[in-house]
A protein has these predicted regions:
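A generic structural signal for solvent-exposed, polar alpha-helical segments
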Residues: 3, 151, 179, 316-317, ...
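Gly/Pro-rich cap/lid or specificity-loop segments adjacent to the active site
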Residues: 12, 20-245
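Alpha/beta-hydrolase fold active-site neighborhood
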Residues: 237-331
Length: 331
């Protein structure tokens, strides 16, 4: 039986604040909105969250009755993209015909955030933490979008653009409120409907094997470098400049970079920072790793601290009905 939160209808929003509009380069009028939404849409009189939406419109068309395009960011656990001005890419194309709404999904960015400190402070331990995080899944995000549609678009149908996990949210939106959507555009992020999370894992392993093979084919000089670093970190984990420890296992998690289009070069450039200024260019167990390398490792892995939803709910986005646990890629 479905939980009440899955069956709940979104509530009417309370528009907390609309900031003064600003016109930026490229003739774009930018308005920032804060809305109040329930933590649990099935219990509208319970706790609430603040939701942040940045609205973009061509200044010359600001008074026109334009349709809305809502952008759903990848993740889970990441705020909406911050646009460049003057606009380019899809932003520029969309602004020719639409008002563009950039939503910081609940728990991210300037919406009420989820933080490690906040979760650890919840009374009730891990069970309470898991219960709280249940309210930050796609079903709640979609109900927030319905609140945004009513408050900022006058209840008119939305066009949706979903990046990665944003596409997962679109599928949930189409399942729950199909009549609210004019059109839905996916950029990656077509969820593996009908497949268990374990099957996603298996496919991801094969893909990562191939990405690793291609990486070392492109940069064969990194084979011995990585082996040397792993051996050294096994023998003596390295303290990181801002706290924490770089173990061999944590170092190998840098392989996540291989999942992006520019990841091969990003990983190679980072590894190069670990090379000592010597003829063979390989670190040994007796030498300290360069501070710049350690700082860049921290920067590459900062999402552990800044985007906890990604690490805590990432696997859950692949659950399909009563399927197995686990999860794979995304982003």
């Amino acid at each position: 039986m479905r939980s009440s939160s899955l069956l709940a209808r979104p509530t009417v929003a309370r528009l907390l604040t609309t900031m003064s509009a600003t016109t930026l380069p490229g003739d774009v009028k930018v308005t920032e909105h804060f809305l109040s939404v329930p933590l649990d849409h099935s219990k509208p009189d319970g706790g609430s969250l603040s939701l942040f939406v940045r609205e973009l419109v061509a200044a010359s068309k600001a008074a026109d009755d334009l349709p809305c395009l809502l952008y759903l960011q990848g993740g889970p656990g990441f705020p909406s993209k911050r646009p460049a001005f003057p606009p380019s890419g899809w932003d520029k194309s969309a602004l020719a015909t639409h008002r563009v709404l950039l939503l910081d999904q609940r728990g991210t960015g300037r919406s009420t955030p989820v933080t490690a400190k906040q979760l650890l402070a919840l009374p009730g331990g891990p069970q309470a933490q898991a219960g709280y995080l249940e309210h930050f899944r796609a079903d709640s995000i979609v109900r927030d979008c319905e609140v945004v549609r009513e408050a900022l678009c006058g209840g008119k149908k939305l066009s949706l653009l979903g990046q990665s996990f944003g596409g997962f949210c679109i599928l949930t939106y189409l399942s729950l409120f199909p009549d609210a959507i004019e059109r839905a555009l996916f950029t990656f992020g077509l969820a593996p409907v009908g497949r268990t999370a374990d099957e996603v894992y298996a496919a991801t392993y094969k893909r990562m094997e191939e990405r690793n093979r291609r990486f070392y084919q492109r940069y064969p000089q990194d084979v011995e470098l990585v082996r040397s670093l792993v051996a050294g970190l096994h023998a003596a984990p390295a303290p990181l400049p801002r706290g924490g420890t770089l173990t061999a296992r944590r170092f190998l998690q840098l392989g996540l970079l291989l999942g992006s289009a520019s990841g091969f070069e990003a990983l190679h450039d980072l590894l190069e920072l670990a090379r000592p200024p010597s003829a063979d260019g390989l670190p040994d167990a007796t030498s300290s790793l360069p501070d710049l390398f350690l700082l860049e490792v921290e920067a590459a892995q900062q999402h552990f601290e800044t985007n906890p939803i990604y690490w805590l709910l990432h696997e859950a986005i692949y659950c399909d009905g009563g399927g197995g646990g686990g999860g794979g890629g995304g982003g």
